[in-house]
Design a protein with these regions (language model features):
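A well-structured
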Residues: 1-310, 597
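Long, K/E/R/D-enriched contiguous segments that form extended
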Residues: 292-330, 336, 344, 395, ...
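Post-HExxH zinc-binding segment in Zn-dependent metallohydrolases
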Residues: 410-440, 450-452, 456, 530
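Catalytic zinc-binding patch centered on the HExxH motif and its immediate surroundings
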Residues: 313-315, 348-368
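C-terminal, non-catalytic "cap/extension" segments appended to globular domains
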Residues: 8-9, 22, 110, 114-117, ...
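Conserved helix-loop functional segments at active or binding sites
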Residues: 326, 330-337, 363, 392, ...
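Post-HEXXH active-site segment of zinc metalloproteases
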Residues: 384, 396-420
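Short pre-active-site segment immediately N-terminal to the catalytic Zn-binding motif
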Residues: 312-317, 367-387
């Protein structure tokens, strides 16, 4: 297939980046304005101590500049992603990243200065002026960090050590990306294929079992070869995070990670405990896989192949658009009409072209459209991707429509809720549609999509979360993070989750060493909690149309104006209790039963 060039894309199929800057000349004009503003930032140093009016002046100046930088950044990033072969946009991106880095570095004095003001005085400022009242919650959040903030000289020393402390992460990135080279893999015909991180998923979904087996072993042979080095890099990363937790007076690495958004630690523990109770449901799902594929010797490299035989369903983009607009009708007329803007106002860059970034995402700023990058190819998965990214964009749209800039985004803890809630609505709509049509293949494919999505997001991410917490606790208790320890812990966890459904290849014990999320800080659990919250919210919306209005007003529109756990609670889901996770797992079991009956 000949790859389309960017210049050959029809305008109506591309995103409207001209709504940010009509021309590159307009971009460079604003770029130069910001360059001139950066030296002025130092004039605001020390000002916040002068009183409420001065504080408001500093906040307004910072916001005005940030909006300009945000516009530049989004334009540069999206232009680069639409065609990485365009040298002009490569230059725009590189220069913008440099400018953005300088800008944020220059404003780094602000938070320490705010925390140098006594708590009652600082919060008193917010009551003095009406225009400052909107910042009160932000100042209250900042105040909670006082006991975890050091003096300016200590902070400076820690900041200076930051780059050196990241050496383990950089070594992992080099081994996992820049220096990675896998052995070529043979298919059943003896043809050799180049294996990369990008092609791994495609080969593992192949119906050619020889190719899958060789792909699996080629990948893990590489990580086996670097086992001790990767144990050292992960160990170094965990030690760095423990160091920061100790220095900033947190009780543990997890306590540090979750405290930023006041997420109770029992949210994490509830997730692991409830999912552990329902491990038999995961094993039942894989037994279903095993039977559907007719394999006695069922291996981990057989997991990704679809359980549904026959030709896949294909969709045009216009059909996908109509389907998603129908699927979200339970959300009410306002939501449907607002989502329609994504198609009429060119939020979406639809089709692949040479040099375009792979995958999909939603991104935009406070003053821009909530843009969506797709690489639409007409599969059922592409329809799910469309409604997923629209969920993110609608969350951003309502947040920015209803919140001031200071609260105009939302935390990672809730980031996947709106997108996954939309997916649940799509599953409900498509299943019912295919059932009415008597389309058994369609019903099976929708259930297969929902089940595999659940396993990948709830079970797999909880398994990762359990491993992450186990090894952090081991380090906290003075244990050594050796390759043998990490391999054994991970392999035991794999066997616990998958039971005796599979015949195990020991290579899987090296899987921990290729997961970049373990280098983040207690991040993966949020995929599973977000998915569970979304399932619970979709049930509320489908059960009573009044709940859709509550969801829009109390969740989608709230941004960062409250703690994420409270935002979800006000929308009808209390993540401090295990109920929503239990409900999601119950729904998973019901879908397995439906699949078995079909």
């Amino acid at each position: 297939m000949v790859e389309l060039l960017r210049k050959d894309q029809k305008v109506e199929n591309t995103w409207d980046l001209e709504s940010i800057f009509k021309t590159n000349e307009d971009f460079w004009k604003q770029f130069k304005e910001v360059e001139k503003l950066i030296p002025e930032i130092q004039s605001y140093k020390g000002k916040v101590k002068e009183g409420a009016k001065a504080l408001l002046e500093v906040f307004k100046a910072e916001e005005d500049m940030m909006l300009k930088v945000e516009q530049l950044t989004i334009y540069a990033y999206l232009r680069k992603d639409q065609d990485s072969t365009d040298a002009e946009y490569g230059e725009i991106y590189a220069k913008t990243m440099n400018l953005s880095s300088k800008f944020y570095s220059e404003w780094s004095f602000l938070k320490p200065e705010l925390l140098s003001i006594e708590e009652d005085v600082l919060l008193g400022y917010a009551d003095e002026l009406d225009e400052l009242k909107i910042y009160k919650f932000e100042l209250e959040k900042l105040n909670k960090k006082r006991q975890h903030t050091l003096g300016s000289e200590q902070e400076k020393i820690i900041a200076m050590a930051g780059e050196a402390l990241k050496a383990s992460d950089e070594t992992f990135a080099a081994l996992n990306n820049a220096d990675v080279e896998f052995e070529k893999v043979e298919d059943k015909e003896g043809n050799k294929h180049t294996l990369t991180h990008g092609t791994y998923g495609t080969y593992m979904e192949s119906t050619d079992r020889v190719l899958r087996k060789n792909t699996f072993h080629s990948l893990y042979n590489y990580f086996k070869k670097h086992n001790n080095t990767l144990a050292s890099t992960l160990g170094g990363n965990l030690k760095r995070k423990k160091y920061y937790a100790d220095v900033y007076k947190y009780s543990s690495t997890r306590n540090n990670a979750l405290s930023n958004n006041l997420i109770p630690e029992e949210v994490y523990d509830n997730l692991v405990a409830v999912v552990n109770k329902k491990i038999p449901a995961l094993q039942r799902y894989y037994e279903l896989h095993k039977r559907a594929k007719g394999l006695e010797d069922f291996r981990l490299y057989d997991r990704a192949v679809s359980m549904v035989k026959g030709d896949p369903i294909k969709f045009t983009f216009e059909e996908a658009r109509d389907i998603v607009l129908e699927a979200v009708k339970p959300m009410g007329e306002e939501y449907v009409n607002d989502m329609r803007k994504a198609f009429t106002e060119r939020w979406i860059d639809i089709y692949p072209n040479k040099g375009k970034r792979s995958g999909a995402y939603s991104w935009g700023g406070y003053t821009t459209k909530p843009f969506i990058l797709l690489n639409f190819d007409g599969t059922l998965n592409d329809v799910y991707t469309l409604i997923h990214e629209l969920g993110h964009s609608m969350h951003s749209y309502y947040t920015r429509k209803n919140q001031p800039y200071v609260y105009g985004s939302y935390s990672i803890f809730v980031a996947e809720v709106a997108s996954t809630c939309n997916e649940a609505l799509l599953t409900e709509y498509l299943y019912n549609k295919f059932e009415k049509e008597g389309n058994k293949n369609g019903m099976l494919r929708v259930l297969n999509q929902a089940l595999s999505g659940f396993v990948g997001t709830v079970y797999r991410q909880t398994q990762f979360a359990e491993f992450e917490h186990t090894i952090n606790q081991h380090l906290q208790n003075g244990g050594a993070l050796t390759a043998d320890y990490l391999n054994t812990e991970y392999f035991n966890l794999i066997k616990k989750y998958y039971g005796d459904v599979f015949t195990y290849d020991e290579d899987i014990k090296y899987e921990w060493s290729r997961v970049p999320h373990f280098y983040y800080n207690y991040y993966v659990y949020q995929y599973a909690t977000g998915y569970s919250a979304a399932q619970a919210l979709s049930k509320l919306i489908l059960g009573d149309s009044k709940n859709a209005k509550v969801y829009i007003d109390e969740f989608l529109s709230k941004g960062n104006s409250n703690y994420p756990i409270e935002v979800l609670k006000n929308a009808g889901v209390d993540m401090s209790k295990p109920d929503s996770i239990e409900l999601a797992l119950q729904d998973f079991e019901e879908k397995i039963e439906k699949f078995e009956k079909l």
